[in-house]
């Protein structure tokens, strides 16, 4: 198992350095030209929501990484209602009630001290989506095998608890967030949760350090389900949003917000999939930028603020 993990990392590094990207010529605002996949040339715009909203999401994304959190703990305008997972085989999943975001589910990032957690993320091959969980996504949709398996273990608990807390608090808004591995799980959860809500709607999905997790068809499906409410935030030169490489068939969905330079207050939305003006305009190589300051709020994984703070960094 350790050998599998090491070989996976070496293969990713090899691909990032050896596979050259084809020359891109601007011919349309959104041009299908990268191995038949979408590349956006749209100019960046201002982020569409108040900064306070992104800060609240960042705080909850950080909080799910904290080992010791008591039920009813308060993070910004949110109260912790439920926690599940051991952060080993199962990523920690926490559910909050937020005054501004509704019922929010947050997943922790990868536990780098756990071999089981590392190997869950190391299973990088694209496989067909499980139609039991995703019956209406686009034909041909594929997902990163390790992430899909991790989500399937959490799915029954997730929907049951969201439905319960919606009824308990008479709340129609449902939001999702997470860092890294947790960001991938929030992405995968969006279609599943939307299909299984008995009331209400997806309010927002805002994730941080989001890796590529599926192919073009999955990215298209996510865009359809999200209806413009999914955003993934890239901090500076963070390497993770560049992995796995597009050369392996992977594709990011729409909704990139790029903070550049890292940890700064300079952020913009880069519309469309794989926008050439956003994080793809540089060679992302930094591991340090993966955990950093997002919207003046630290997301430091297990080494960050616990309890999380909001807008204080």
UniProtKB/Swiss-Prot annotation:
Q: Which InterPro entries match?
A: AB_hydrolase_fold, Fungal_lipase-type, Sec_MonoDiacylglyc_Lipase
Q: Which Pfam families does the record associate with it?
A: Lipase_3
Q: Which catalytic reaction applies to this protein?
A: a monoacylglycerol + H2O = glycerol + a fatty acid + H(+); a diacylglycerol + H2O = a monoacylglycerol + a fatty acid + H(+)
Please give the positions of the paired cysteines in each disulfide bond: 66-306
- The record's active-site residues are 180 (nucleophile), 238, 290
Enzyme superclass (EC): hydrolase
Which sites carry carbohydrate? 72, 111, 263
Which cellular component terms (GO) are annotated to the entry?
Answer: extracellular region
Signal sequence interval, chain numbering: 1-20
> Which is one GO molecular function term here?
hydrolase activity
Keyword list, A-Z: Cell wall, Disulfide bond, Glycoprotein, Hydrolase, Lipid degradation, Lipid metabolism, Secreted, Signal, Virulence
Q: Which Gene3D superfamilies match?
A: alpha/beta hydrolase (3.40.50.1820)
Q: Where in the cell is it found?
A: Secreted; Secreted, Cell wall
GO terms (BP aspect)? lipid catabolic process
Record EC number: 3.1.1.-
- Its domain of life reads Eukaryota
Family according to the record? Belongs to the AB hydrolase superfamily. Lipase family. Class 3 subfamily.
Q: What does this protein do?
A: Secreted lipase involved in Dandruff and seborrheic dermatitis (D/SD) probably via lipase-mediated breakdown of sebaceous lipids and release of irritating free fatty acids. Shows activity against monoglyceride and diglyceride substrates, but not triglyceride substrates and does not exhibit regio-selective production of diacylglycerols. Cleaves oleic acid from 1,2 isomers of diolein on both the 1 and the 2 position of the glycerol backbone, resulting mainly in free fatty acids but no monoolein is detected.
Q: What is this protein called?
A: Secreted mono- and diacylglycerol lipase MDL5
> What is the originating organism of this protein?
Malassezia globosa (strain ATCC MYA-4612 / CBS 7966) (Dandruff-associated fungus)
């Amino acid at each position: 198992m350790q050998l599998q993990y090491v070989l996976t990392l070496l293969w990713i590094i090899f691909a990032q350095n050896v596979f050259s990207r084809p020359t891109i010529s601007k011919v349309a605002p959104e041009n299908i030209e990268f191995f038949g996949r979408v590349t956006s040339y749209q100019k960046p715009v201002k982020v569409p929501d108040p900064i306070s909203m992104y800060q609240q999401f960042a705080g909850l994304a950080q909080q799910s990484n904290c080992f010791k959190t008591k039920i009813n703990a308060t993070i910004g305008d949110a109260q912790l209602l439920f926690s599940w997972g051991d952060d080993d085989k199962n990523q920690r999943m926490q559910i909050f009630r937020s005054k501004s975001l509704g019922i929010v589910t947050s997943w922790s990032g990868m536990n780098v001290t756990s071999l089981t957690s590392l190997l869950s993320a190391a299973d990088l091959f694209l496989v067909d989506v499980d139609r039991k969980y995703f019956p209406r996504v686009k034909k041909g949709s594929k997902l990163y095998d390790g992430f899909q398996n991790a989500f399937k273990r959490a799915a029954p608990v997730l929907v049951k608890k969201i439905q319960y807390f919606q009824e308990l608090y008479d709340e129609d808004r449902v939001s999702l967030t997470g860092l890294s591995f947790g960001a991938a799980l929030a992405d995968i959860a969006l279609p599943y949760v939307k299909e299984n809500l008995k009331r209400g709607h997806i309010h927002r999905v805002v994730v941080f350090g989001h890796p590529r997790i599926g192919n073009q068809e999955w990215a298209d499906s996510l865009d359809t389900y999200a209806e413009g409410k999914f955003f993934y935030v890239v901090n500076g030169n963070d390497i993770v949003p560049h992995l796995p490489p597009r050369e392996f068939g992977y594709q990011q969905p729409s909704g990139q917000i790029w903070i550049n330079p890292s940890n700064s207050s300079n952020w913009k939305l880069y519309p469309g999939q794989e926008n050439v003006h956003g994080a793809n305009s540089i060679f992302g190589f930094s591991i340090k930028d993966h955990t950093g300051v997002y919207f003046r709020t630290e997301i430091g994984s297990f080494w960050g603020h616990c309890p999380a703070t909001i807008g204080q960094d």
